[in-house]
Structure formats: structure tokens, C-alpha cells
Amino acid sequence: MEEVPHDCPGADSAQAGRGASCQGCPNQRLCASGAGAAADPAIEEIKEKMKTVKHKILVLSGKGGVGKSTFSAHLAHGLAEDENTQVALLDIDICGPSIPKIMGLEGEQVHQSGSGWSPVFLEDNLGVMSVGFLLSSPDDAVIWRGPKKNGMIKQFLRDVDWGEVDYLIVDTPPGTSDEHLSVVQYLTAAHIDGAVIITTPQEVSLQDVRKEISFCHKVKLPIIGVVENMSGFICPKCQKESQIFPPTTGGAEAMCQDLKIPLLGKVPLDPRIGKSCDKGQSFLVEAPDSPATVAYRSIIQRIQEFCSQRLPEGENLVGS
């Protein structure tokens, strides 16, 4: 599939789907039909629903297997350690929902209330929602086309009764697909704080992260920063660090310097992280002295600082 062209006339333009730059665009037929110009009424409904959510953070990755969902889960765990902070974790990886397993909530079900779907609560201040809670078995495959995935995301954002929330963390699938376009479209009016992008040190991962950064720029999604996962290996016996995935091109640090993107931190590979996820436990609690935990906590603090500097919806910087 080709990328949306840089000089796209926009769905509202008279040239939508007909201009020279529209040739080869995957959305050409949709734009030409005029359907793309009609505002989705769900956007306003979601905006109203999200008024009780202070901060909204998307967690992205260019590739699968780089630890994106693990990071999302531990970001939620870390923020929720403050009992006065209300945290919500939304899993929109529709075809690969791993959050229920990582959070120790496999087998839980979603209940309907008068005010919408009730999230599954791990703690009084940590609610979770995932398509995994809607499956009869964790082994069931979700084989859906884009429109059905988009409809599910719309329901999660509009129909879940999150209540008063300080942080909504959205765990997305890898890449830049329908799910990403949908969540950005639905949440933009509700003020997204930004995206955290997860990578590993190898160039094969960084290549896709650059595409993810390009996606963020195109849809005007602020980038909170990049996290380099699996950045060195901590031996559980001697606690010494060695390189499993050498940063052949300088890793995330060099890429961030080149693109002027904040590097939030580097999380070393600790085998206990995987064990904690398999058990559905917080690694931050199980291994508080691990260098990986220290890195996680530093990154979480930087994300909190970023969000605290974001202006409330409707306010603008002087002179902007």
C-alpha cells in the first residue's frame, strides 16, 4: 500500500480523490465518493466522553516484538502506584491483544452498566479494557477487516465508562494501520498529549520507527519521546551488562539526535521482565532494584513531566 501523498488536497476539498496527487493513494475511492468529507458524529460523542480524562498517551512501535505492550503495562503499573492517580489502560491491538495476559486478567469479562461498559479493574485506581475480554478463549483468532476494527475502537472510546481518569494509556498494534488512524481521528478533538514510540537498538527496528515518526508528523500527533527497549542485557547471576542487540548505527540515541526527538531512556533486557509478564505481575514491584526498573521509573517520570506541561483543552500558548 502506498503512503498518503504529502500534497493531499484533503477529504473536504473539491479535488478530493480527483487531483493528480490522489493517483495511487489507498483512500482515493473513498475521498472521491464524498464519504470522507462527512464528519463522524462519534467524534463529538467521544470528545464529550473524554472530558473526564486528563491525559491521553498512545504507545506506538514500528515493529512487533519490541516490548511495546510490556512497556504500556508497566507505564500503567508505575503511574498507578500513586493511589491518588486514576489510570486506564486501553488495548486496541485488536488482532493480538496481549494486555489481559500481561496484567494478570486473563479470563475476566466485561460487564454492561447503565453508563456503558465497565472496564476490568486490576486495582481500585487501574482499569483495563481489551478485546481479549470479549473472546471466549485467549486462543481465539480475531479475523476482522478495517471497518470492524474501527467500530470496535469507536466503542471502546465512546461506550466504556472510564470515570474520572488522570492517564489513559492506549496500547496500539505495531506499524501504522487502520487502528492508528482511527484512534488519532477520534481522539484529536479530545486533545491527545502525545505518543511514546518503542524500539530496540538494531537498525532493522529503527528503520520502522522512522516511519512511525513520519506518521506522527503527518497526522500532527505530538511525540513525547522514544524508548529503547532491550538496550543491553543484565545477567541475573552477576548483574553485569552485555550487548545482545548491538546498536550498529548508533541505536535510538543517534536516531533521536538526528531527528531532534527526545530519547526518554534505555531499558536493559532483564529475563525477569518476561517472567513477570507471564505471571501477570508488575516487574517494578517484583524486581525493584533491577537496572531495568530504575530505567522504567525514570522514563515514567519524564512522561509525567511532559504531560504536566501540556495545556488543558481549549487553551493556547501566547503568540502561537
From Swiss-Prot:
Q: Which InterPro entries match?
A: Mrp-like_CS, Mrp/NBP35_ATP-bd, NUBP1/Nbp35, P-loop_NTPase, YlxH/NBP35
Q: How is the cofactor bound?
A: Binds 4 [4Fe-4S] clusters per heterotetramer. Contains two stable clusters in the N-termini of NUBP1 and two labile, bridging clusters between subunits of the NUBP1-NUBP2 heterotetramer.
What GO terms fall under cellular component here? centriole; cilium; cytosol; nucleus
List GO molecular-function terms, semicolon-separated.
4 iron, 4 sulfur cluster binding; ATP binding; ATP-dependent FeS chaperone activity; iron-sulfur cluster binding; metal ion binding
Pfam families associated with the record:
ParA (PF10609)
Identify the main location.
Answer: cytoplasm
List residues binding [4Fe-4S] cluster 2: 235, 238
Localization recorded for this chain is: Cytoplasm; Nucleus; Cell projection; Cytoplasm, Cytoskeleton, Cilium axoneme
Chain positions recorded as [4Fe-4S] cluster 1 binding sites: 8, 22, 25, 31
Q: Which domain of life is it from?
A: Eukaryota
Chain segments annotated as transmembrane: none
Residues modified to N-acetylmethionine:
1
Please list the cofactors this protein needs: [4Fe-4S] cluster
Q: Does the keyword Kinase apply?
A: no
Keywords for the protein's UniProt record, in alphabetical order:
4Fe-4S, Acetylation, ATP-binding, Cell projection, Cilium, Cilium biogenesis/degradation, Cytoplasm, Cytoskeleton, Iron, Iron-sulfur, Metal-binding, Nucleotide-binding, Nucleus
Claim: Isomerase is one of the keywords in the record? no
Note the subunit structure.
Heterotetramer of 2 NUBP1 and 2 NUBP2 chains. Interacts with KIFC1. Interacts with the BBS/CCT complex subunit CCT1.
State its role. Component of the cytosolic iron-sulfur (Fe/S) protein assembly (CIA) machinery. Required for maturation of extramitochondrial Fe-S proteins. The NUBP1-NUBP2 heterotetramer forms a Fe-S scaffold complex, mediating the de novo assembly of an Fe-S cluster and its transfer to target apoproteins. Implicated in the regulation of centrosome duplication. Negatively regulates cilium formation and structure.
Q: Write down what this protein is called.
A: Cytosolic Fe-S cluster assembly factor NUBP1
Q: Which gene encodes it?
A: NUBP1
